[in-house]
Amino acid sequence: MEEENLLNENLLHPNESSPEETQVTTVSKSKWTILVLAMILLLVYLTFGVCTYSFFRDQFSGTETNLFVDAFYFSIVTFSTVGYGDIVPSTSTTKILTIVLVSTGVVFLDYLLNRVVSHVLSLQENAILDRINKTRNRAIRDHIAEDGKIRLKWKLCLAFCAVGLCVGSGALFLHVFERLDWLDSVYLSVISVTTVGYGDKTFKTVEGRGFAVFWLLLSTIAMATLFLYLAEMRIDRTTVMKLPPSESEFIVFKLRESGRISEDDIKQIVREFENLEEVPSSGS
């Protein structure tokens, strides 16, 4: 009878979640909130930009293709700060609306770079770490990851690869669909990815501008990621330089600088030292 009552109580009142599970759930909800808020802000921004261009089309000057494609293209070119100049406001009304569009775009871009990009990079790093931890080769794990994080040099490699992929895909598209030669294709792709946007070469077809809507957004995120990692590397170097070195650290640094020992040698010595600490001292 007592066992039945206990079973019924467990069924009616399941065990409460542990603090760790509650914390993980809270963090997960917070991350999803960031992404949802970013999508809402981007949707509101694009809606405002598209409406501005669509309702006041006659008050903009530039090359026309398709109304809605041009509207999205104008919004993304403004948001990404590329600013080709192929579509520009020509009246006081559209200039005021463009000022509002640019101002809100700067605020949202700051949120996108500081919150969303950091969150996406964290997800990417966790996914890569999961793949690395599954490998049986410990040397590969130690070479790529350290203290549960991917080494900064590998993050930079991934960021450079992402930027290179954006440049390459953009150049290929420009050569095939915009009929530019290879030099101009690479030139416009680099100018766009780096958000310089001189305006001497631009997207002029419906297909090109439709591609630019997505490509410029991804390229802006890729460049922001690269800048974040470069800034992180500079901060790390500055922090290390400001730390007061001990005599042993200086000796290890000089040996490593001269090539007499490698990073793997240092790690092996550290492991031996840690194993030595774990061995209990024998009593007398």
Swiss-Prot record:
Q: Which family does it belong to?
A: Belongs to the two pore domain potassium channel (TC 1.A.1.7) family.
| Name recorded for this polypeptide | Two-pore potassium channel 4
Topology of the protein relative to the lipid bilayer: Multi-pass membrane protein
Chief place where the protein resides = membrane
- Is Cell cycle among this UniProt entry's keywords? no
**What ranges does the record give for the region Disordered, renumbered to this chain?**
1-21
The entry's function note states: Voltage-independent, instantaneously activating, potassium-selective plasma membrane ion channel. Open rectifier. Regulated by cytoplasmic pH and extra-cellular calcium. Has some permeability for Rb(+) and NH(4)(+), but none for Na(+) or Li(+).
Localization: Cell membrane
Which segments occupy the membrane without traversing it? 70-89, 184-203
Protein origin, superkingdom: Eukaryota
Key words of the record: Cell membrane, Ion channel, Ion transport, Membrane, Potassium, Potassium channel, Potassium transport, Transmembrane, Transmembrane helix, Transport
So which stretches are on the Cytoplasmic side? 1-31, 114-156, 232-284
According to the record's subunit comment, the protein's assembly and interactions are: Homodimer.
Effect of a null allele: No effect on pollen germination rate and growth.
GO molecular function per UniProt: potassium channel activity
